[in-house]
Amino acid sequence: MNDTVTRLQADLCVVGTGIAALNALAVASEYLEQGQQVVLIEQRAQYGGMWNDAYPFVRLHQPHELFTAGSIPWQGDRPRSYLATRQEILDHFANILDFVRARVRVDERYGWEFTEHEERDGRVLVRARNADGEQLEVDAAKLIKGFGVEVRPDTPLKFTSDHVRSIGPSTIVERRDEVYNGKEPIWIVGAGKTAMDTAHLLVTEAPGREVNMIIGGGTFFGKRDRLFPNNRWRVQATPNMLQAAVARRFDGTNEEDVRRWLREKYGIGLVPEAKNYFFGILSEAENETIARGLTSTVRGYLADVRDQDGRPELVLRSGVTREVPAGTWIVNCTGLITPVGRPYEPYSSPSGNVLTLSLRSATVLLSSFMAYFMTHLMYRDLLTTTPLYQVDYSELAKVAKPASPYVMATIAQYNLCLLSDVLPLRSFLDCGLDFDRWMPLPHRVAAVAAFAARRKRDGARMRAALDTTRDRFGVRCGPLEFV
């Protein structure tokens, strides 16, 4: 065992360098004074969080300018509607760190895994360890754990048969010639954003290949053409407005009605009766290209691939089987946002000196937004006095997956009502993540006025829906006990 211990002093320690952690870091740097010390702990070899593990052909859902930290702008002159690539996102993260380094001193510790923390004497002792067993101890005034969504790297599925080739999306690029030029069929498992990206890649770059999808219950997306139209003066509904509309409709029991309304009014996907929605965004052109290029779309869930009389066959949970040729490619596009087994931890410690950003105690829909607003609360000493609702999304997704997106939209909208009571307007105007920035200023002003006019009435209704969710499913959904 390596007994080497490095000890550091800091005004703030941040764990992680993904979009959640970087938003927390950017906001905190606005409150810290020039020259104050921040220690950044990241288990990977470089900044970027999940974007280091994402498949190479991934692109953003939203226009690139709306994916940032704090109010830090993108560099370059890409069109506003441009959907950034993985490398461009990582380059922007580097730009974010440059901005923060100009404000405060940042000690970046890559290759260190956070292990634990303890509060004592009004400060936080943070411990981490590297691959060599060396230990790091940071004595910090505040700690922000930017775990975020913690997306899993793509992992091949395991099957009984060894006569098929099971891969993840990244392997398509690594084995491009084999995949693109082979004769064996390709089966994509999944119907979310990863599956659609994978299908779009294959049908456009390997035209003529047999590409099939097993889509489970089906997934639908928000129409990018409607949510982010090229003519910004013709915006009818931004994702913010969509979230608010969902929250006003959901009463804690009617997720099927809300799903049907949302699919019919704003949705797009491969099948009309898709059951799943995860806040993804897709254009009509992308959807049409994929639908036209696929050989088949199969509803159901893949349980196994087994050999029958020496020949592999797909086995669905329903018991339906389908023979496939030996050498068939099976691309796993499922489980990337499956909650990891992290234990529950409230978003704030009783002292307010530790902020934890995770799905186990979620307060706002996306981890980036959660980090942005919760860090503002932390540095204004409002973290333990603002009665935000939290929801244990990890448990909710297990016991009530169909309701989970509508619960998340409702809790986010409800908490925005509370945040608007305690944070200055500037905190909202400076949020570079705000989807309403896609609209011209007069439209944004009108949206703010509409929100202000309805927030008291809507807030009471949303709180009742969240209380119903808690009672109905038995999940943690409500204020922290000490708030």
List each language-model region with its residue ranges.
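Rossmann-like dinucleotide/flavin-binding elements
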Residues: G18-Y31, R175-G222, L365-L418
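Short hydrophobic core segments
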Residues: C13-V15, L136-V151, I186-V189, P325-I337
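Glycine-rich dinucleotide-binding loop and its adjacent helix/turn
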Residues: P79, T85-H92, K145-A206, V211, ...
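Long, internal scaffold/assembly segments composed of regular secondary structure
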Residues: V235-V331
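Glycine-enriched catalytic-core subsegment of oxygenase/oxidase enzymes
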Residues: G48, H200, A291, S296-R299, ...
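Feature captures the FAD/FMN-dependent oxidoreductase FAD-binding
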Residues: D77-P153, G269-P272, F279, E286-V315, ...
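Extreme N-terminal leader/targeting segments of oxidoreductases
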Residues: M1-L12, E30-Q36, L136, V149-V179, ...
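Glycine-rich active-site loop/strand segments that organize a redox cofactor
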Residues: Q43-N95, E174-R176, I214-K275
